[in-house]
Amino acid sequence: MSQEPRLTKKDFASDQEVRWCPGCGDYAILSAAQSVFAELGVPRERFVVVSGIGCSSRFPYYTNAYGFHTIHGRAPAVATGIKIANPELSVWIVTGDGDSLSIGGNHLIHLLRRNLDVNVMLFDNRIYGLTKGQYSPTSEVGKKTKSTPFGSLDRPFNPLALALGAGATFVARSIDVHAPHLKETLKAAHAHAGTSFVQIYQNCNIFNDGAYAALRDKATRPDHALELRQGEPLIFGRNRDRGIRASGCHRPEVVQLGGEV
C-alpha cells in the first residue's frame, strides 16, 4: 500500500510573486501558515483558502492550494457554502480588521453562531492598508488617519469579545512575528471541531507602524504578553514576577508577585 507523500512548507508556496510591502507582517503569517499546513496531515487538495478584500486577502494567490478571492466582507458566506458542499475540506478564511469587522461584520457573527468547522485568521493591523491608511473598526480612540484627521471618535471593537458574544467555540490571539506561538495556535484551531477564530496582531509598517511594538519586540514582549495555557497560573514578566487575579469586582488586575501576593 502506497503512502501519501510527506508535504513540506515549499509544497504550499505558490509560483506567484508575493506583493506585500517590504517588512509587512503578512509575510511572517504566510510563512507560519504554510509550515502548519504541511504538518497537519491533510492532503493539499483538501485545503481551501478563502479571502475577502484587503492586503491580507491576497493570501490565496500565495498559497499553493485551492483558493477563492471573494468580494468585500463576504468570505464567511462563501466559506460556509464550500464547507457545506464538501465537509471533508479544510477551510481557512483569511480576512482583515476592516474586511471582517466593518462591511463583513454581519457575515462574521453568523458564521460564528452557526459553528461550522472552518478556521478564521483575522489579520489585525488597526488600519486600512490597501486603501492607503484610513481608520478601521479596531483603531484606537483619537487615532489620526487620512479619514480621521482630527482623531477617531469611535471606540474600537475587541474582536475576541465580539466573537465570544456571537457564540464562538474557539477564540485565540497571536502575533505575526512570534512564529512558535502562532504555529501552535493555528494547529489548535485546526484540531477544534467547530469555527475557530484567531485574531493575529499584524504590523503595517507603512501606514500604522509600531501599533504593537511592545508585543513584537522580544525585549519588551515578556512584560506585556501572557501566554494562556490550560491549568497553568496566569504568570508573566521577564522574571516571572507578575500575575493576574480577579479583583473584588471580579475584574482582572495585574499584580506584582512576592510578599503577600
What are these regions (language model features)?
Residues 1-6, 15, 206-261:
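Flexible, low-complexity linker and terminal segments
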Residues 6, 10-71:
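Active-site diphosphate/adenylate-binding microenvironment
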Residues 8, 88, 136-188:
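Conserved thiamine diphosphate
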Residues 53-128:
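Thiamine diphosphate
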Residues 66-67, 111, 136-140, 189-190, ...:
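Short, hinge-like loop/turn segments at secondary-structure boundaries
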Residues 105-112, 130-143, 162:
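Active-site-proximal loop->helix
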Residues 169-227, 231:
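ATP/pyrophosphate-binding catalytic subdomain of soluble kinases
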